[in-house]
UniProtKB/Swiss-Prot annotation:
CDD domains: F-box_AtSKIP3-like. The gene is PP2B13. This is F-box protein PP2-B13. It comes from Arabidopsis thaliana. Residues 1-44 form the F-box domain. Coiled coil: none annotated.
Length: 284
């Protein structure tokens, strides 16, 4: 292998993985040169990478190599008038998207008395939506499987925060759904905030079993009896899992993702919504 010509090594690396190509530079100078070649990194780039760059907020940037383009996509790219964020995993090349709050549908988001838009310091986007008050919550997004990695299991996650003045989020569970036009259907229920035992005790003291009665308005779909609620992310936000789906090679499918709470007629507010992330689920 050490005596193979550079072109031959490059051809071999193109049939491996981005992780192998990155580590090849440690083998020898021939492997380092082959591992930097445009031929290799063209194989690992998404087929629509030129379109992605042309849609990006940094579309005038000049790249010196295909490997530099790959690294740029690993760092993430704002596209579609900065309404979406595109990213690939450095070592697997798998594609992820975040649809901003402006790129999804949120109940009453165009009514200032129900929802306010502002720049949140640690958001990826210029605006996030804060739910002020409503008795109906519907958040919906969609994505085409053709822009994702084929033959991959994906998860969809609502990225959000709960403000200090939040209210009405823990009485009725919301319903989550991920549905595709080709028949995939994944449903569940989740609460919009984490359990606070002290608050729960106070509510039971003042309201008795009102919470249990209201929760019964939502059909239990999980089946395992677990209380689902937001989980902390590494970036300081919270996320709620909406569901899972699988992409197939050569299949053009539309995936619809949603979180709704419309049955309890419970006033609620204090959620900041950054968007919906669609990312590959790591193999166990």
């Amino acid at each position: 292998m050490m005596m193979l010509p550079e072109a031959c090594v490059a051809n071999i690396l193109a049939f491996t993985s981005p992780a192998d190509a990155f580590s090849s530079s440690e083998v020898s100078s021939v492997f380092r040169l082959a591992g930097d070649s445009d031929f290799v990194w063209e194989k690992f780039l998404p087929s629509h990478y030129k379109s992605l760059i042309s849609q990006s907020t940094d579309h005038h940037r000049i790249f010196s190599s295909k490997k530099e383009i790959y690294r740029c996509l690993c760092d993430s790219l704002l596209i579609d008038n900065a309404r979406k964020l595109f990213k690939i995993n450095k070592f697997s090349g798998k594609i992820s998207y975040i649809l901003s709050a402006r790129d999804i549908s949120i109940t009453y988001s165009d009514h200032a008395s129900y929802c306010s838009w502002s720049n949140v310091s640690d958001s990826r986007f210029s605006e996030s939506a804060e739910l002020i008050t409503t008795d109906r919550l519907e958040i919906k997004g969609k994505i085409q499987t053709t822009v994702l990695s084929p033959n991959t299991k994906y998860g969809a996650y609502l990225i959000m925060k709960v403000t200090n003045g939040a209210y009405g989020l823990d009485l009725v569970p919301a319903e989550t759904s991920v549905k595709s036009k080709n028949g995939q259907n994944n449903k569940n229920t989740t609460y919009l905030c984490c359990l606070d035992e002290k608050k729960q005790q106070m509510k039971r003291l003042f309201y008795g079993n009102r919470e249990e009665r209201m929760a019964m308005t939502v059909e239990a779909v999980g089946g395992d009896g677990k209380r689902r609620e937001p989980k902390a992310r590494d970036d300081g936000w919270l996320e709620i899992e909406l569901g899972e789906f699988v992409t197939r090679e050569g299949e053009d499918d539309e995936v619809n993702m949603s979180l709704t709470e419309v049955k309890g007629y419970q006033l609620k507010g204090g959620i900041v919504i950054d968007g919906i992330e669609v990312r590959p689920i790591p193999l166990k």
